[in-house]
Design a protein with these regions (language model features):
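Basic, Lys/Arg-enriched alpha-helical interface segments
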Residues: 1-66, 70-86
């Protein structure tokens, strides 16, 4: 049986724009990684930074991709604001 946390990943326009320029295979891989973050929403990120509005966001390196995100526990969503290939 597959794991399910009840959380869903959601991409910002900026994160979605990052995916558009990738191959179909890489798009699927990155989306799978985003779903892994949603599967474990309480995991500790690699580090935190402040976004443009001064809110704390988490940064997590998964493979060759750095995900910047915040978790909205009230609605069980992981809001991915930026994805960067490192």
């Amino acid at each position: 049986m597959a794991e399910f946390s009840g959380y869903e990943s959601h991409l910002s326009r900026q994160a979605a724009a990052f995916l558009i320029g990738r191959s179909r295979r890489q798009q699927c891989h990155v989306l799978d990684l985003a779903d892994q973050i949603a599967l474990h929403p309480f995991q500790i990120s690699d580090y935190q930074t402040d976004d443009d509005d001064g809110h704390k966001v988490d940064n997590l390196l998964l493979g060759e991709f750095l995900f910047t995100y915040w978790v909205d526990h009230a609605v069980k969503e992981v809001r991915i604001t930026e994805i960067t290939k490192v």
